[in-house]
Amino acid sequence: MSYGAEQAVRDVSFSVPNGEVFAIVGESGSGKSTLVRAAFGMLKQASISGQILLNGTDISTLSDSDWRQLRGTKISMIFQNPSAYLNPNRTVENHFKDLFRAHGESYDVSRVIDMLNLVHLTDGERILQSYPFQLSGGMQQRLAIALSLILKPGIVFADEPTSALDMLVQASVLDLMKEVTQALGATVIIVTHNIKAAARIANSIGVMNKGQLVEVGSATEVMAHPKDEYTRILLDSVMKVV
């Protein structure tokens, strides 16, 4: 995968079993966010070789209209900073209504309140009448999780979903993501620079360095017995911070 003459990601191949969480770990510039954004159809300007398969279909070749139908119902994305894409002029309820309308579904308020309860936003009726800027950062990210899952996609991508949150909130949001996606049977591919956070939520971990996937294994194996020198450096840096 390249931009012009610059190759951002190369020779990357992995598969994720249904219902599991796969974490892609690496420093800024390692190519991890580029990889998931390509898989979500956000990098049309990139030159992509190879395939991105969803249930046997190469989704990298889809038209724009096909991508619009796919996002939300089959795949979804949780971004780093929800305040950057939640519309401050629209109530929370209108965000859900817009999403249902975009995919030709009738709005179901009881279904939405059930989802809000699932992400621990328990005062559903008040939340629906609120505007995003009236919610805390942690509540906004819980709302983003609810929006990404309300149409029951099979795969959820999460690009640094906790990096904009306070340390005390990060762990609870990660635990919530795992709890909710497991309850719904969704497969999760999460990108993070924090290998400790990856181990908290993931069944398996892939480590990226300079555009390549240098190590893949179960979370337990990667944390306890890293095979690649770069993985060991990431683990050492976490230990030094702790």
List the model feature ranges, each with a label.
Residues 58, 109-126, 235:
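Conserved ABC ATPase "signature" region
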Residues 59-76, 102, 222-226:
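ABC ATPase NBD coupling module
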Residues 198-200:
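A short, surface-exposed alpha-helical micro-motif characterized by mixed small hydrophobic
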Residues 48-58:
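Conserved ABC transporter NBD signature motif
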Residues 131-135, 139:
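Conserved ABC ATPase signature
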Residues 150-154:
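A short, proline-enriched helix->beta-strand linker immediately N-terminal to the Walker B motif
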